[in-house]
Every structure is written in structure tokens, then in C-alpha cells.
């Protein structure tokens, strides 16, 4: 295997015949670096196919209907498998053959599918973050976010991925040393700069902004929910001060009970007006688990794509860096393919409770209930929210029952009295 000049790993880095100041630049590969790159690509392709296949098999074994999160994991696994089959594998074949063996139609199809798969992977990741955002930040709307809407939203994301890949159809075959190379049709330096910025914004920068917004809001709402629990406990403590007041008179016992409940309700409503999430039961552990899962996937997306696009933009404006091929640059150019390998192992690492369907839904509490409903609610929450305060509620409940019995006995005695 002799030294040769070939196309770089990724179609966006057009270092094969880069135009810089009207001068065509051909980066040189050595044989050892080419062998290393092919070996790493083969390993990445196998890991992506094997890991995502395991995830799909695990979900297929489940006999129950898939939840929204599980359905999105299926879509992510399918897109990662498509990256391995239609992006990594064609790149391996092209690097082994050195030259492109097809015609112009095959060249355009190759340029289109290799980039469309990466668009699809990024956009489906955004849909996953959107699902978590609706589930956590808008729990009432989440009940209308059915599996059918997940299918429709994912289909829209895939359609946008195909639309964003249309510029790749403008590809050409370049004659080089007795063979042909397939590359985008970038005849001027300005076209190359516009092409690089389009790839940077559509695949990395805009998705990154959306992911930061979704997960920023999720973290804020989770923090608010935790703070709301503390507010609920403090309001419960203030309500207990009313409950501890002794019952002085049999006649005013029912009225004082109603006043205590009214004061407790007013305090809770006042706190909920400041913090709407304080009236909720909080974010469940299963939702926290899915947040950690999707956050890990997004973190891997950022780690893998940031160095790659940094090199892409640096090569766009630096002619010397554009023609350089060092092991460090090759490793950085391989990172986008690594993202498809890490996702399935993240899913399996969080498989403890993610695969389990949530049996109950969290509904926000309302405060339009009757006096008896409030007393039952307070009694039901004695083990979690108020702790030892249940003793006070129980004692007052017993006192009310005793007063009612005393009233009944007194009435019976008066009716049976000969006077």
C-alpha cells in the first residue's frame, strides 16, 4: 500500500481537492495512518451495529407496549444503525479502494446518504429532549403527547434531515491520478466557507442551542420541584400550629376545625401562587432516571461533535491545516462515528428502571375539596410530609369523635329524663 491522496473521512471536510486562493490543495496520507484509520472505522462499525442491535433485542423481548421514552430509544438505535451501515461502512469501502468506482449518480447518492444519517441522528436526539421537556415542564400537556404524536414528530425530524441533506446532491467526480474522487462541488473559496458554515450550524450549533434550552428548563423545573417540597413541609408545620390549639367548647369545635382547614388551605394556595410546582407531588424517580439517560446522550453528542467541528472550521480558514493529516486530526475526525457507538451502552447502563412502564401518573393537586377531603389528605400524608405531626391530627380526630359521642349521650339522657 503506497502513499496516496484520498478523500477525508467525513464528506463535510473537503480536503481532497480544497480550493484556497484559487489554488488546489491535495492532502497527503501515509500508508500506516490509512491502515490505522480503516481499522478504527471497522471497530466503530461493529460496536455500533452490535450495541444498538442488543438494545433493540432487549426492547423486543418486552411483551408490553413501549412507552414514549422506549419508543424514542428505538428510533435512536435505528438511526445509529443506519449511521453504521450508510456512513461508516461506505467510508471504509472508499478508503480501501482509494478511488470512487461508481458514476456521477452513485457519487451523489453516496454524498447524500452519508450526511443524511448524521442529520437524522441529531434531529431524533432533539425529539427525545423535547419529549422529556414536555413530560417534566408541562405535565398536563404530556398526557396528550401520545405514541402517535411521537411517530409524527420523529417522521418530521427525519424529513427535515433529508431536506438539509439536499445540498449534498451537488457532487462531482474529480479525475485524479488515473482514478476518480467523489466530492461536493465547491469550485471557489467562498463556496467552501458557506458549505462549512451550513454544516456547522445545521448539524451542531442549532441542535446544541435547542438541547441547552430544553435541559436548562428541565433542570430549573426539577430544582423548583425540590424547593416546592420544602415549602410544602414548612406550610404543613404552620398548619400544625392551628391544629394544636385546644378545643375549649363543644359548640365551637366544628367551627374551629373549619377555620383550621381554611387557614391551612389559604397558606398552601398562597405558596402555590408563588411557586406553581409546589402544589405538585414532585418529579418521580423514573423521570429523574430518564433525565439522566438523555442528559448522558446529549453530553456524548457534545463531546464527540465539538472537536470535529472545531477542526472543520479551522480547516476552512487555514490552508496549511487543511492539507495536514496527522494522527490527532484523524482521531478527531472519527469522533462523530463514535457517538453512534456510545449511545446503546448508555441505554443499557440506565436500563434498571427506564424499561419499566410508569404505573401511575402525577397530577397537580387542586384545593377545591371539602373539609373532610382535606382531613383525609392530611392524614394520608402523615408518613411522608409531616412526620410526627400525624399524632396531633389523630388526637384531634379522636377528640372530635369524643365530643360527638358526648353530645349524643347528653341528648339521650335529656330525652329519657322524666322532667
UniProtKB/Swiss-Prot annotation:
InterPro entries assigned to the protein according to its UniProt record, in alphabetical order: GPCR_Rhodpsn, GPCR_Rhodpsn_7TM, Vasoprsn_rcpt
Annotated transmembrane regions: 38-58, 81-101, 109-129, 154-174, 193-213, 293-313, 330-350
Region called Disordered, residue ranges: 253-274
GO biological process: cellular response to hormone stimulus; G protein-coupled receptor signaling pathway
Any one Gene Ontology molecular-function term assigned to this protein's record: G protein-coupled receptor activity
GO CC entries: plasma membrane
Keyword set, alphabetical order: Cell membrane, Disulfide bond, G-protein coupled receptor, Glycoprotein, Membrane, Receptor, Transducer, Transmembrane, Transmembrane helix
Membrane-protein topology: Multi-pass membrane protein
Topology Cytoplasmic: residue spans: 59-80, 130-153, 214-292, 351-419
Positions annotated as glycosylated: 3, 22, 185
Tissue expression notes: Present in the nervous system and peripheral tissues.
Biased composition (Basic and acidic residues): 259-274
Name under which the protein is recorded: Octopressin receptor
Lineage: Eukaryota, Metazoa, Spiralia, Lophotrochozoa, Mollusca
Gene, per the UniProt record: OPR
Amino acid at each position: 500500500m503506497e502513499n496516496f491522496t484520498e478523500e477525508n473521512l467525513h464528506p463535510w471536510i473537503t480536503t481532497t481537492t480544497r480550493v484556497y486562493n484559487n489554488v488546489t490543495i491535495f492532502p497527503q496520507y501515509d500508508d500506516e495512518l490509512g491502515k490505522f484509520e480503516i481499522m478504527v472505522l471497522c471497530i466503530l462499525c461493529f460496536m455500533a451495529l452490535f450495541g444498538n442491535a442488543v438494545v433493540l433485542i432487549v426492547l423486543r423481548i418486552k411483551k408490553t407496549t413501549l412507552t414514549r421514552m422506549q419508543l424514542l430509544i428505538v428510533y435512536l438505535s435505528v438511526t445509529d444503525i443506519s449511521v453504521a451501515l450508510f456512513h461508516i461502512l461506505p467510508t471504509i469501502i472508499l478508503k480501501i479502494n482509494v478511488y470512487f468506482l461508481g458514476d456521477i449518480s452513485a457519487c451523489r447518492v453516496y454524498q447524500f446518504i452519508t450526511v443524511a444519517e448524521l442529520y437524522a441522528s441529531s434531529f431524533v436526539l432533539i425529539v427525545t429532549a423535547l419529549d422529556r421537556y414536555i413530560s417534566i415542564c408541562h405535565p398536563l400537556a404530556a398526557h396528550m403527547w401520545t405514541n402517535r404524536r411521537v411517530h409524527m414528530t420523529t417522521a418530521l425530524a427525519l424529513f427535515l434531515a433529508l431536506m438539509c441533506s439536499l445540498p449534498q446532491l451537488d457532487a462531482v467526480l474529480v479525475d485524479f491520478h488515473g482514478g476518480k474522487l467523489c466530492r461536493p462541488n465547491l469550485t471557489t473559496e467562498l463556496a467552501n466557507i458557506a458549505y462549512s458554515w451550513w454544516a456547522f450550524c445545521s448539524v451542531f450549533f442549532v441542535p446544541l442551542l435547542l438541547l441547552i434550552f430544553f435541559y436548562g428548563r428541565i433542570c430549573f423545573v426539577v430544582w423548583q420541584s425540590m424547593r416546592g417540597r420544602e415549602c410544602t413541609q414548612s406550610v404543613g408545620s404552620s398548619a400544625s400550629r392551628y391544629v394544636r390549639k385546644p378545643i375549649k367548647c363543644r359548640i365551637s369545635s366544628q367551627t374551629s376545625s373549619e377555620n383550621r382547614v381554611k387557614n391551612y388551605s389559604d397558606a398552601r394556595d398562597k405558596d402555590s401562587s408563588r411557586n406553581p410546582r409546589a402544589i405538585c407531588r414532585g418529579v418521580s424517580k423514573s423521570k429523574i432516571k430518564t433525565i439522566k439517560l438523555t442528559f448522558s446522550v446529549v453530553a456524548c453528542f457534545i463531546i464527540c461533535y465539538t472537536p470535529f467541528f472545531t477542526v472543520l472550521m479551522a480547516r476552512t480558514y487555514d490552508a496549511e491545516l487543511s492539507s495536514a493529516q496527522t494522527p490527532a486530526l484523524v482521531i478527531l475526525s472519527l469522533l462523530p462515528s463514535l457517538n453512534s457507538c456510545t449511545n446503546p451502552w448508555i441505554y443499557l447502563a440506565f436500563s434498571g428502571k427506564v424499561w419499566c412502564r410508569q404505573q401511575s401518573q402525577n397530577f397537580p393537586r387542586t384545593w377545591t375539596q371539602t373539609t373532610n377531603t382535606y382531613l383525609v389528605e392530611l392524614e394520608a400524608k402523615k408518613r411522608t410530609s409531616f412526620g410526627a405531626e400525624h399524632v396531633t391530627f389523630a388526637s384531634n380526630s379522636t377528640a372530635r369523635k369524643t365530643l360527638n359521642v358526648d353530645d349524643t349521650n347528653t341528648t339521650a339522657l335529656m330525652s329519657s329524663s322524666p322532667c
